Amino acid sequence: MVTGIQITKANDSALINSFWLLDEEKSQARCVCAKSGYSEDQIVPMSDLGQIEYREIPLEIKPEVRVEGGQHLNVNVLRRETLEDAVKHPENYPQLTIRVSGYAVRFNSLTPEQQRDVIARTFTASL
């Protein structure tokens, strides 16, 4: 269990009024903030703090959120005819932007092969 503390008395004056997170299981202390001598997030053995007096600080520890895996979906809201016409008449569609692999790209900046590939992947005959 992790305990939050504010050191009120210590032999080392740099520790006074500093805030720490104590992990009893690992016998470690993590500095939250100190005036000098210790940096934020510095981890030291609890024994390095020496003889100290402190007051406990209430902590609200939220469970760690883990997100693994996931899906990615590109959605182009166009008709097939619009893209096919943009291939034939690019001058009529100078601002036509589509999503390709998570990036926004101007359709006319793609090579003809890439344009055909986008049309083939975007529009299928059946699922």
UniProtKB/Swiss-Prot annotation:
The keyword Kinase does not apply. The modification Glycine radical is found at residue 102. GO terms for cellular component: cytosol. Keywords: Organic radical. InterPro entries: Auton_GlycylRad_Cofactor (IPR050244), Form_AcTrfase_GR_CS (IPR019777), Gly_radical (IPR001150), Glycyl_radical_cofactor_GrcA (IPR011140). GO terms for molecular function: formate C-acetyltransferase activity. Pfam families: Gly_radical (PF01228). Gene3D superfamilies: 3.20.70.20. The keyword Transmembrane helix does not apply. It comes from the Bacteria. Residues 5-127 form the Glycine radical domain. Acts as a radical domain for damaged PFL and possibly other radical proteins. This is Autonomous glycyl radical cofactor. The lineage of its organism: Bacteria, Pseudomonadati, Pseudomonadota, Gammaproteobacteria, Enterobacterales.
